[in-house]
């Protein structure tokens, strides 16, 4: 062990939380309708599998893109050789336009300010390297994505200080919570370099409100720190709401070309909106030239392959396809989310009202034996091992209130979701029955004790009396 680095031998990787342990249990016993119908159903994976048919149809109609051809001629050799680390110009242009389309074309993105990365994990870590020294801190509102404990801290040496949010207001960010987190960092002698938020929120499945976004911009302005807005779920907003980006707020405040705008950075990827996590396509957007320059150099450690860029530049440049895809994706997500909510309600379980994402923030506080995180983990173990559902406990997301869970709904078929809800309902009903029996037994024992005490008091009082009083 002495021959290995401290980074290797320490447990600072952040992957020993229940979030990752649930995945491990699933992988040991994965559900399969035919091969393993009693296996664990994966509801802890935020994966969008609802619109593969649309992409596959497009690929069938555009064989050149899928076959690495141009005008029918192979360009395999051209793509196989070294390319500019900055990325293919046509892909960065198509990606910028796709990001604009998701935001209703209210804001613009300059392709020259985009840095490509191998997914948002790589993009977020790269920004940490650019903005923070080891030991510096970023403030994150809770609950937050459990992977950030690994992505932001492990290799960079940066620290996370939580902004504690409460269910009393739907876990929205408040000015007092921001100030308290900042003051806590100071007490810990940590230099705060910025705030990082996910918008839409992972794990809440809600967009940040304009009030929250304005508050964040005002806060980082007053403290002279950075704001990272991870917007990888921006294309998953469903319902009547439109996604509101931090870029919208900068425009509303006339800060688009200001010094403040240089401290606002966006992370994006195609993993959630297009359902392509295996393609490893992420991006950083920054108005700071030094950040763009440094991040571009760092991107050599996590490039996006030229073949992937070529295929996706053709896909994203097809405006008819992207328009149809975004509309249909949002419709299907809304239908699937409603199906999950209905299934939960049938089991007597509610969740935070959501309008985005691939998951719901589910309230199971009433199923806890006690209002503790120990009880939450016990419930989680029962759901994983007995009910055979892998869901993510709120404690893994640093939620301050026991009993909340993130439950994903877009990575499975409707039939599998129905089965998952059936299993959960049966578990809740059996738990309720046991509680009724337990309460009935408790009441009988309590009543028996009362009668026993009453009889004892009567006997004592009778024997204490003198003969004439009996």
Curated annotation (Swiss-Prot):
Residue numbers of N6-(pyridoxal phosphate)lysine PTMs: 272
Pathway field: Alkene biosynthesis; ethylene biosynthesis via S-adenosyl-L-methionine; ethylene from S-adenosyl-L-methionine: step 1/2
GO MF annotation: an example: 1-aminocyclopropane-1-carboxylate synthase activity
Extra remark beyond the main annotation: The stability of ACS proteins, and the regulation of such stability, play a central role in ethylene biosynthesis.
GO biological process, alphabetically ordered: ethylene biosynthetic process; fruit ripening; regulation of translation
Xref: Pfam families: Aminotran_1_2
Disulphide linkage map: none
Function of the molecule: 1-aminocyclopropane-1-carboxylate synthase (ACS) enzymes catalyze the conversion of S-adenosyl-L-methionine (SAM) into 1-aminocyclopropane-1-carboxylate (ACC), a direct precursor of ethylene.
Chain residues that bind substrate: 47, 85
Protein name stated in the entry: 1-aminocyclopropane-1-carboxylate synthase 9
Highest taxon listed in the record's lineage: Eukaryota
Protein family (similarity comment): Belongs to the class-I pyridoxal-phosphate-dependent aminotransferase family.
Reactions performed catalytically: S-adenosyl-L-methionine = 1-aminocyclopropane-1-carboxylate + S-methyl-5'-thioadenosine + H(+)
pH dependence (record): Optimum pH is 8.
Induction: By cycloheximide (CHX).
Keywords: Ethylene biosynthesis, Fruit ripening, Lyase, Pyridoxal phosphate, S-adenosyl-L-methionine
Post-translational modification: May be processed at its C-terminus.
Gene expressing this chain: ACS9
EC number(s) on file: 4.4.1.14
InterPro entries membership: Aminotransferase_I/II_large (IPR004839), Ethylene_sulfur-biosynth (IPR050478), NHTrfase_class1_PyrdxlP-BS (IPR004838), PyrdxlP-dep_Trfase (IPR015424), PyrdxlP-dep_Trfase_major (IPR015421), PyrdxlP-dep_Trfase_small (IPR015422)
Cofactor: pyridoxal 5'-phosphate
């Amino acid at each position: 062990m002495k021959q290995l680095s401290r980074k290797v031998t320490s447990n600072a990787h952040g992957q020993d939380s229940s979030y990752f342990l649930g995945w491990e249990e699933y992988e040991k016993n994965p559900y399969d309708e035919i091969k393993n119908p009693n296996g664990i159903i994966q509801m802890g994976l935020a994966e969008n599998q609802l619109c593969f048919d649309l992409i596959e149809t497009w690929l069938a109609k555009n064989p050149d893109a899928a076959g690495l051809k141009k005008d029918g001629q192979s360009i395999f050799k051209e793509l196989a050789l070294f390319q500019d680390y900055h990325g293919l110009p046509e892909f960065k242009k198509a990606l910028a336009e796709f990001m604009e389309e998701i935001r209703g074309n209210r804001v613009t993105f300059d392709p020259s300010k985009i840095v490509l990365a191998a997914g948002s994990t790589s993009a977020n870590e790269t920004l940490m390297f650019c903005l923070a020294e080891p030991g510096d801190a970023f403030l994150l509102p809770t609950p937050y994505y459990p992977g950030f404990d690994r992505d932001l801290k492990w290799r960079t040496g940066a620290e996370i200080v939580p902004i504690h949010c409460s269910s009393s207001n739907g876990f929205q960010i408040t000015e007092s919570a921001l100030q308290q987190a900042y003051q806590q960092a100071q007490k810990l002698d940590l230099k705060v370099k910025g705030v990082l938020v996910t918008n839409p929120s992972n794990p809440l499945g809600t967009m940040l409100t304009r009030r929250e976004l304005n508050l964040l911009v005002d806060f980082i302005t007053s403290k002279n720190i950075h704001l990272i807005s991870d917007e990888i779920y921006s294309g998953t907003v469903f319902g009547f709401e439109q996604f509101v980006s931090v870029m919208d707020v900068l425009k509303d405040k006339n800060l688009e070309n200001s010094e403040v705008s240089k401290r606002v950075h966006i992370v994006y990827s195609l993993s959630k909106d297009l359902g392509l996590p295996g393609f490893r396509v992420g991006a950083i957007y920054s108005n700071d030239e030094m950040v763009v320059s440094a991040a571009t150099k760092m991107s050599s450690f996590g490039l996006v392959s030229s073949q992937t860029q070529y295929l996706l530049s053709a896909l994203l440049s097809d405006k008819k396809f992207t328009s149809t895809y975004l509309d249909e994706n949002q419709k299907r997500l809304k239908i699937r989310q409603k199906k999950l909510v209905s299934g939960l309600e049938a089991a007597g379980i509610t969740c935070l009202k959501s309008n985005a994402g691939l998951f719901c923030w589910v309230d199971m506080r009433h199923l806890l034996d006690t209002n503790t995180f120990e009880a939450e983990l016990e419930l989680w173990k029962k759901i994983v091992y007995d009910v055979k559902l892998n869901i993510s406990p709120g404690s893994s997301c640093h939620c301050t209130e026991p009993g909340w869970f993130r439950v994903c709904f877009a990575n499975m078929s409707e039939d599998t979701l129905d089965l998952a809800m059936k299993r959960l309902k049966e578990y809740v009903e059996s738990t309720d029955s046991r509680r009724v029996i337990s309460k009935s037994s408790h009441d009988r024992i309590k009543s028996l004790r009362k009668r026993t005490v009453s009889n004892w008091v009567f006997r004592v009082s009778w024997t204490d009396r003198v003969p004439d009083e009996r």
